[in-house]
Regions:
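Class I S-adenosyl-L-methionine-dependent methyltransferase catalytic core
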Residues: 1-185
Length: 185
């Protein structure tokens, strides 16, 4: 697994031995960034269920303002931190080694807003709808922002979750990317 573009281009990232962490393949990541690249520059990113931190680090490499990495696994967070250091993006990074609900609630209380929110949790733990609802309830998504949910192609998602609506879906073998945006007020 590597950083595809930007100031850390070509950097090989550390990956865990833990099977719960399923890093986004380079092929899927490249396709994803072809879609979301207009959202990256100078914006804030939330990498929920960060795993290796690959998606957030890719955004920072491409010019994102900052990224908050959230993962409750100590092993995953150790890898995220080592990858942040390796990519030399410590100043633009915040790490939260807590569960997603606590993180989302805390970030909401602080008034944080994000233009890109990644949700790439282990496939067998179906917390996506809960995570989408929490993000909506805590007003974390900028009005013009986008949420990217990476999941197994067998899983289907509702058209709407609170004020969020499904704007797009792309399939890559057994991996699907589902995109949500905020309904206009």
């Amino acid at each position: 697994m590597r950083v595809i573009s930007g100031k850390a281009r070509g950097l090989k990232l550390n990956t865990p031995k833990n099977e719960d962490v399923r890093p986004t393949t380079d092929r899927v990541k490249e396709s994803l960034f072809n879609i979301i690249n207009p959202y990256v520059m100078d914006n804030n990113v939330l990498d929920l269920f960060a795993g290796t931190g690959s998606l957030g680090i890719e955004c920072l490499s491409r010019g994102a303002h900052k990224c908050v990495f959230v993962d409750k696994s100590k092993e995953s967070m150790a890898i995220v931190k080592s990858n942040i250091k390796k990519a030399r993006v410590e100043n633009e990074s915040t790490t939260l080694n807590i569960d997603f609900k606590s993180a989302v609630t805390s970030l909401g209380r602080q008034g944080e807003k994000f233009t890109i929110i990644f949700m790439d949790q282990p496939y067998y733990k179906n917390m996506f709808i809960d995570a989408l609802s929490s993000v909506d309830e805590n007003n974390l998504l900028e009005e013009d922002g986008i949420i990217v949910v990476e999941h197994d192609t067998k899983d289907s998602f509702p058209e709407n979750v609170g004020r969020l609506y499904k704007s797009r879906e792309k399939k890559y073998g057994n991996t699907t990317l589902t995109f949500y945006k905020m309904e206009e007020a």
